[in-house]
Amino acid sequence: MQKLLQDRVAIVTGGAQGLGAAICHRLAREGAQVVVADLNLEGAEITSAQASAQTGCRTSAFKVDVTDESQVEAMIRHALAEFNRLDILVSNAGILISGPVEAFPAEKWRAVIDVNLYGYFLCAKHAARVMIGQGSGVIIQINSKSGKKGSYKNSAYAASKFGGIGLTQSLALELADHGVRVNAVCPGNLLDSPLWVDSLFKQYARNQGITEEEVRQKYIAQVPLKRGCTYDDVNNVIVFLASDQASYLTGQAINVTGGQEMR
């Protein structure tokens, strides 16, 4: 059976753990050769080795800070040196820091924008240079439901994600003539992910004055389908967007939220 992404070459930023690692594994299972890019090189190497061992696909790990343009350029050069082309960029690297606006440290607010929006721009810029030359390519940003609706005491993250959708649409318009499609995926709450378990439950419980379990139940109650988002939910959409099945889709920001954005 032909795999949807057979012999495509993909870069996944933020690929060392959590959703990023799950994306790398799924792309490899679909036949892609994957560069696992992350600030955490050790984690990227583990993900790369596991994905290759489980699928037989070629993978590679690369250390990158997506806010450093020279490092992003080096990441693209690495992909070309290893695999000779670049078909898919999944811009997944991101951070989330929440807090009340009146007490939000400006440097932390700026850090969220730098990673989530400026980092996406840099990766898309240098991937686009290659894809324009090839006459084909797919750029996918991992956005959020917070890119479409304001988020309580989460102004930096929401601002970065709203900006990401604007950037996605603008790049889609600019690159369409070159055969390059640009889309975003807007996941709901990945309640069982390391991001939530290790960080967000604690942040939100503190900011909202409730327990971590009450935070979980609050967010589940907001979802018409009454469950959290899973990695498979997100990856099903990523694979579709990266494949030829989505050849007529560009400039879209697809919700994967169980209907939460309607509440």
Cite the ranges covered by each PLM segment.
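Residue(s) in the substrate-gating loop at a strand-loop-helix junction
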Residues: S144
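Active-site loop immediately N-terminal to the catalytic Tyr-X3-Lys motif
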Residues: E102, K149-A156, D177-H178, K226, ...
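Short, small/polar-rich loop/turn modules that mediate ligand/substrate recognition or access, typified
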Residues: R85, V90, A176, R181, ...
